[in-house]
Amino acid sequence: MRGLRPALSTFIFLLLITGGVYPLLTTALGQWWFPWQANGSLIREGDTVRGSALIGQNFTDNGYFHGRPSATAEMPYNPQASGGSNLAVSNPELDKLIAARVAALRAANPNASTSVPVELVTASASGLDNNITPQAAAWQIPRVAKARNLSVEQLTQLIAKYSQQPLVKYIGQPVVNIVELNLALDKLDE
C-alpha cells in the first residue's frame, strides 16, 4: 500500500504534464510562431478555402498540371488514409502499376519528348505529396498549353514563378506546389 501513493502521484503528475501542459504549450507556441502552418497552411481565395499547401489534389483534366499519384486509392489525396502503398521495389504488382501510369501519362502527353519523370508515376511516402520538380511540371507543358491555348513561354514563366528552392542549397531540390500552380493557371483565365 505504501508504493501506491508515489505511483499514483507520479501518474497524476505525468498525466497533467503530458496530457495537458505539453499539448497546450506546443499548440500555443505553434499558433504564435507559425500561425499559417499550425492552421493547415490553407490556400484561400477570399472567404473560400481552395486547398492546402501541404496536401495534393487530384487534378486529372488536361488543362491542369498533374501531381504525384496518390497512394490513397479509393479517395485520392484523402488525408485520413495517409500512407504509402507499401509495395516493395521487387513486387511485380508495383511494376504493373508503374507501367500503367506511364502508359496513361504517355497517352495524355503525346507531345512530350523525354521519358516520363519518375515522380509522376511513383507515390510519395505519405501518398499525399503536392510537390513535383520543375522538370516534371515542364514535361507536362505541351498538354496544358494545348488544352488552355497558352504559350509554352507563359507556362514556363508560371512554373519558374511557383518554383521553390530548398532551404539549404545542397540539400533537396527545387519543387513546384501543384495546387498553387493550378490555382494560378485558373487566374490566368479570368
From Swiss-Prot:
GO molecular function annotation: ATP binding; P-type potassium transmembrane transporter activity
UniProt cross-references to Pfam families, sorted A to Z: KdpC
Localization in the cell: Cell inner membrane
KW Transmembrane (keyword) present: yes
Main location (coarse class): membrane
Membrane topology category: Single-pass membrane protein
GO cellular component labels: plasma membrane
Alphabetized UniProt keyword annotations: ATP-binding, Cell inner membrane, Cell membrane, Ion transport, Membrane, Nucleotide-binding, Potassium, Potassium transport, Transmembrane, Transmembrane helix, Transport
Family annotation (InterPro entries): KdpC
Stretches that traverse the bilayer: 10-30
Biological role: Part of the high-affinity ATP-driven potassium transport (or Kdp) system, which catalyzes the hydrolysis of ATP coupled with the electrogenic transport of potassium into the cytoplasm. This subunit acts as a catalytic chaperone that increases the ATP-binding affinity of the ATP-hydrolyzing subunit KdpB by the formation of a transient KdpB/KdpC/ATP ternary complex.
Subunit structure: The system is composed of three essential subunits: KdpA, KdpB and KdpC.
Family: Belongs to the KdpC family.
Protein's name in the database: Potassium-transporting ATPase KdpC subunit
Source organism of the structure: Escherichia coli O157:H7
